[in-house]
Structures are given as structure tokens and as C-alpha cells.
Amino acid sequence: MPFGSVGAMLSQMEKETSIEKVIILKGAGGRGKTPTLHLLIDLLISKWATRIHDDGYTSDIHQDCFVILDLPGFGNVGIITYGDRGCEADVQKALNECLGRGCRAVVGASHMQYYKNPPTVYKILWDFGSTHNAKTVETTTIIKADGWGQSINETSLNTICAENLFNLLLKL
């Protein structure tokens, strides 16, 4: 096989495994970002995704984690629940792992601020999408307003949000 063909083949492989989508689930602390992303992980696993990288995933939906799932027919998806201040290095490490594992999409939690100094999780995620020319979307959880909607189950709202994130992954 001529060298040019190998180069073209490697270029095509890189193109097929480049980051295409970055979804930022943003919001203030205690708004359900981590539980929603745990529900998204469970939803993807129910769609036959397999975990190929696991850093801290447990059945505790309030426990931060980072996983990479291989979703049949789609490819690898990185899901990062670290979004609080002080987690910037963990988020950057997770993004590097996503690149190394050929993720097509990344979904990450973040507080809402986009400050340049120091770089926030939001800025790190946003800049990551921009650097890789990915389709980048920010969204929020569905928030139950205080004082009304007492009968609304927050798990139901988080499940609806997780289903919306799943649709964004597939249709964005």
C-alpha cells in the first residue's frame, strides 16, 4: 500500500473519531445536574451502551463520576459530572481521556459562570468544544419552583431532562 494511502486512511480515522458534540448541562449547585447525568448513563446502558472507562460511577446518583460509554451505532460518549469549582483539573483530565478514547460526544455538568480567570469548568467545556469545532450546546435541568408544584417529583423532572440529553446526542 503506498504511503499516501496510509496517510489518507489515518486522516480518515482521525476524522471519524473526532469530537463532534459537546453538551454542557449548566446550573447552580443543588439543581440536579449530577443525578440527571447519572440517569443519562443508566438510559444509555439500557440502550446497550457498554462502559469502557469508569471513574467513580456508583449507584449513588449524587456521587460525581466520569464514564465513557460505547453506544452501538453512535460511538463513544464521555459523561462528566464534575462541575463544581475546584474540579477544573479533573474535568481537563476527563476531556483528555475522551480525546484519547475517540469520543464523538462529551456531556458535562457545570456551574453557570464563564470567567476567563481563573478558567471555570464552564469555560473549559466551552473552549474544548470550540477548539475541536464541535457542535456545542448548553442547557439546564428542569427546575421545580419553590412554593408550587409540590406534587412534582424531582426524579421525574431529571428523567425528562436525561431523555432530552439523549435526544440531543442523537439529533444534534
Where are these predicted regions, by residue range?
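Glycine-rich phosphate-binding P-loop
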Residues: 22-44
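Pre-Walker A-like glycine/lysine-rich segment at the N-terminus of P-loop NTPase domains
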Residues: 13-21
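A short acidic (Asp/Glu
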Residues: 13, 35-37, 89-91, 116-123
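Conserved nucleotide-sensing/catalytic segment adjacent to the nucleotide-binding pocket
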Residues: 52-111
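Residue-level preference for the first positions of well-ordered beta-strands
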Residues: 20-24, 105-107
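N-terminal pre-Walker A segment at the start of P-loop NTPase domains
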Residues: 1-14
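Post-Walker A helix-loop "phosphate-sensing" segment adjacent to the P-loop in P-loop NTPases
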Residues: 42-55
